[in-house]
Amino acid sequence: MKPYGKIPDNSIKSLQDLMQLLKKSKDFITLEIASNNSSIVISYFRTLIDVNIFHEEVLTYIKEKSFNSLQDIHSVLPFENSKITNQIEDIQDSILNGYILIQYDTDKLNCLLVNVSKKEKRDITKAEIEYNIVGPQIAFVEDLDVNLNLVRRKLPTPYLQMKELKVGSLSNTTVAIVFIEGIVNDQNLQEIIKRVSQIKTDHVLDSTYLMQLIADNPNSIFPQFLNTERPDRVAAVLAEGKIALFVDGSPYAITLPTTLIDFFSTTEDYTMPWIIASFFRLLRLFAFIFSVLTTPLYVSILTYHYELIPKELLETLIISRSKVPFPPLIEALFLEITIELLREAGARLPTKVGLTVGIVGGIVIGQASVEASLTSNVLIIIVALSALSSFTAPIYRIGNTIRVIRFPFIISAHLLGLLGIVLTSSLLLARLLRTESLRRPYLFPFYPTRPTDWKDSIIRMPISAMFRRPIFSRSKQRFRFNPEEVEKNKILSRNDFDD
């Protein structure tokens, strides 16, 4: 892949040009070894290779034996990922990924590439962002091969297929497109391959970069694709006919296409009885609405609609605001911004310190602001409950969206009261109706209406009732299993018990 921008894209025309450029770097090493009246030149980046393997399994063989050609060296070295080539781009990519370059002085055209790369890996740990009490606990890591291994262990089928693409003219990052052959919709697959192939940028360092580059509408504050750290979640969406993207160096996978409801479901929902899982899903959706609308309703009612408040509650509000010199808008914005500052500070500081700052800071600032008559104690309770409700979102990115859209609602409530809240809600709904994920409607299965997919939306029906794959993914195989066989087995089980 040729670099863009100010980096010259025609400076490397031969192997000699490449070697001259690489030798400018202090960590690029070149060794020369005599063999049968000829010389063998070995070049590599010492920061990219495993030095122990290189000395024990490469240098030892080359120094102890005599060779007459590159093919002789190739046949002796005990490495599978080795090749003889004269392609400059292939040589460049290989050296920069931890290969060593071996040249034989009688062969000026070809060279041998041997993979002795060193990759630093961290151990597989528990999921921290999408933590579950019940169910699998492991999470992805930054190594692409490890992540693909975790998915294959969840779905050990030959129909699980992977395609790899390179993106980023400088980073040359590997992107793996994972799907199940025979279930995935070909149109979806070709569309995502097209989008990834058309990326023109110099670096892609994480899956979040990729999400922005392939989004249907990159200016939307609503996430159009879901990124997850859980292998079980990826396996589940692949079985539905969706697609997963992995970026080398990122501990998160991207699943697509996605609906808004997907951001309020968890893998733990499928480990519970369906009634309990449905209750928690409804609770999360209610918390989403509560978090967005509660503070704007407070501003609206205190600014325009006192008559809507019961007399006893109105007296309490008047007493709590009697010494506050600011209008409800300034009061609400002050507390909301304070909460956001505490969140951001807690997230950036070390875990224990951040937790302390969040708790102590919230208590101290809240108490001090009431005593200083900057805010009312009622609003502190409302803002605290709104913040708490936003934490129920199981996906971090949708939680950020909730935090942002609350502010336009507060301002519109101050300007137009309840009418402003209704207008802002209408504009938000209109925007969501136009939003797409991989050219699929974001509010599916409610718009367009598909009752067959309601079984796993705001509620979750029993798994035995979800024998069809979602229409949304347009999978080739609509049925997960034959429902008649399930019912037949139930009848046989009852008959066996009765006998």
UniProtKB/Swiss-Prot annotation:
Domain of life: Bacteria
Any single Gene Ontology cellular-component annotation: membrane
Transmembrane annotation, as ranges: 285-305, 376-396, 409-429
Subcellular location: Membrane
Predominant place of localization: membrane
UniProtKB keywords: Germination, Membrane, Transmembrane, Transmembrane helix
Membrane topology: Multi-pass membrane protein
GO biological process: spore germination
Family of this protein: Belongs to the GerABKA family.
Function: Required for the germination response to inosine. Has no role in L-alanine germination.
Entry protein name: Spore germination protein GerQA
Naturally occurring in which organism (per UniProt): Bacillus cereus
